[in-house]
Amino acid sequence: MKQTILHIGLEKTGTTSIQYLLRQNREQLLKSSVLVSEQAASGNNFHLAIASYSPFREDGLTRALRLTSAEKLEGFRKREFDALAAEIQATSPAKLILSSEHFQSRLLSLADIKQLRSSLEQAGCSNFRILVYLRDPLKIAMSHHGMAIKKGIHVTESFYRPEHPRISHIVNHRQTLENWSAVFGDENMDVRLYPEASGSEVLISDFLETVGIEQSQLDMSKQEVRNVNLSAVALEALNQLNAKSDRVRLLAEDRWLFHQLE
């Protein structure tokens, strides 16, 4: 394999839109010898991030996947990376693209990242390139907490402090770059700035150019606006409601209230 591209986020830098476009064009990309792993139905390879926890730890994703012990995590790791190895062997791609913001936001230690690299190499990956989009920490906090409000969480002023546990690990850009370059090498880091004032099409164009994909290789109509933020007025109203009621949390699954506020 000529190249393995790990797109590691950050959270709130348009990852969902990128992943959706890649997943919808998987067959088209294979014709150009570019593999987008079929493991992730949404295009988000978060399973590989969770499988790289070293050591095992419990969080919302491990609970959702019913990974309750180190032994279960080890079995999960083997299944996930064996499946990736089988995909690589079946398609013999020149390039593999793996995308998940959870690579950055969940793999916080050198041991985690080393485990990811080791497992990927055993699956047949090589020639790594780490692609990360950095964004103004305050903008990340605002977007992150806006999503939390839509899920029924009451956000207070303390949430916007950089040391708050919901965002501290995401906005510490220096630590992120130090950790990933320590494992994969400075020369393999591709650090870019999120195009803050531009539309999603600018981000998509930048991503495709960076990973070496021509737009002519894709069906660009297979795009979707994802994770649209509510207006400031709507968010404030919703946040005040969250302070007094769990109604929003209960409605979050069908998004009825969000549609009324947007």
Question: What are these model-predicted stretches?
Answer:
Residues 1-262:
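Anion-recognition interface
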